[in-house]
Amino acid sequence: MPFKSGFVNIIGKPNAGKSTLMNAIIGERLSIITPKAQTTRHRIVGILNGEGFQVVFSDTPGIIKDPAYRLQESMNRFIEGSFQDADVFLYLAEIGQKPRKEDIPEQLQDTTIPLILVISKIDTGNQAMLEEHVSGWKALLPQAEIIPVSATNRFNLDYLLNSILHHLPEAPAYFEEDALTDRNERFFVTEIIREKILLNYQKEIPYAVEVVVDEFKDEPQIAKISAIIFVARESQKGILIGHKGSALKKTSTEARTDIEKFLGKKVFLAIQVKVSKDWRDNEKQLRRFGYLS
C-alpha cells in the first residue's frame, strides 16, 4: 500500500478551537489552550505518524481582521504562509459562529486544494443549531466537506482523520518516524509560562508579554531554566509581579509544575520581569522574539 504524507493546515478565527483539535488528534499537548483569543501566536507543527502515513498538522494563530500592532501583523503573516504549502485545509468554525462569507479567507473561497470545514465545539450546541450551520456553510463553501466534531469529547475525530488521509497525496515522510513537532523544548517552556500568564492575569497584561528562555541546562536529574518575561510598559511590570511578588510566584509555581510534566524530571525555574518598551511595534524586538525573519 503506498505511503501517504502531507501538510494539513488549520485555519480559523481566534478561539475557534484550532489548538484543541490538533492536540486531540495528535494525542499530545503541543499548543497551549486558554479561553482568551489570540492564545496562539506562532505557527506550530504537530506530527501524527501511523501505519502507512504521516500527517503534518499546522496550528496557526487566529485570523485578526484589524491588527492593532506589528505583532498582530506578523501573526497574520504566519497564516498567509499556511495558505502556500497545504495539501489539505481544515477551516474551523465553532458552532456559535454564524456562517458568513466575510469570515472565510479569500484564499479558501475558490481553492482547488481539498477543503474540510470543521464545525467545532458541537458539544456546546444542539441538533437544530448544527443542522442550521451545516446548511449555511454548505451554501457558502459548496466544495468543502463538512464534518462536525467535538475535540473535548473526541466525537468524529477518527472520521475526520480518515477524511484527511483520503485527501493526502502519496509521498515519503517529511520527518523522522518518531518526530512529534519541529519545535524545541525551549519553545514549549516559553509557551507553558505564557499560558499561565494568560490564565492568571486579565485585561492587557496577557497580550503585552513575551517570554524568552535565556538559559536551559538539561542535567540528568534536573533541568535548570532561567526565563525572562518582557512587558511593554513599566506599570505592567508591577502588576505582573504583584504584592511582594505573590502574583509572579503563583505563575512560576504553576509553570514549573507543567514544565516538570513536559520534561519528565525536576525543574528549577527562575523568572525575571523586564520592560521592553512597546515591543509589539518594535521591529528589532519582533525579530528577536521570532515574529519576523
PLM feature segments, named:
Residues 114, 123-181, 185:
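Canonical P-loop GTPase G-domain recognition
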Residues 185-293:
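P-loop NTP-binding site
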Residues 52, 76-144, 217-219:
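Conserved C-terminal guanine-recognition region of P-loop GTPase G domains, centered on the G4
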Residues 1-77, 81-83:
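Conserved G1/Walker A P-loop phosphate-binding module
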Residues 40, 64-65, 98-99, 125-126, ...:
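Catalytic P-loop NTPase motifs of RecA-like helicase/translocase cores
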Residues 17, 156, 247:
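Conserved glycine(s) of the Walker
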Residues 28, 47-51, 63, 82, ...:
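Conserved, well-folded catalytic cores of nucleic-acid-processing
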Residues 59, 120, 150:
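Active-site glycine-centered loops adjacent to acidic/histidine catalytic or metal-binding residues
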